[in-house]
Amino acid sequence: MVRLLERYVKYFPVTSDTPIISIGEGNTPLVRLDNLGVKLGIELYGKCEGLNPTGSFKDRGMVLAVAKALEAGSKGII
């Protein structure tokens, strides 16, 4: 499985010194939202971010934050 940092490396401030880490975040499914889509007159989809490892959309952003903290030599993160 391609990890989030690897997949979006050209969009993130990732260098060769940035550790590529993952807790299995990302790759959440798109679900068609038929009822709301019909009301809005569009084809509408939503992401199931609750299926990330911690059940939160924050997993995506935190993997980059933790990788950059590790790159900077941080011993801990609060």
Model-identified regions with their sequence ranges:
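PLP-dependent amino-acid enzyme catalytic core
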Residues: 1-78
